[in-house]
């Protein structure tokens, strides 16, 4: 066994992991859009945001503290009261910090790579193929869970409908740039081509 493998095994043992790797799927049930303080309406489209960027909120939603690796998930809740289909492109969303630095979202697939269970390390703990398969199954559940909660790449907001999705940002340990940042969310009316931008300011420290 090489030094890296030994180190991984010792780490897993040290934090109390056993052969039974698992991922618990948590529900995500948004509140009525009026309940969110962080919201804005433009051209009959309302978008609210809730940063899930504390240990407690992240674990309650994703079963894992995503902030530990510097990720800040933000829940978007949307309501389209216009008569048109509205296009929201996830890659167009920007998080702008107090110094004007702009960050784009990261995909759940990139994030999952940092959190997935090390299948070989579980097997090396002495439980063989059964532990390997357990970790593999947990990784599949985690991938399905986090990707299903993620805002789709091109979200069509239908007239008189509500929808929601999570946008993930990688900000680094401690999420230093999240307080006093702003979310810029471009929208496009598909019938007219008219464009609007919703700006949501995340004031003060990340909400507890």
Named regions from a protein language model:
Residues 9-18:
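Bacterial N-terminal signal peptides
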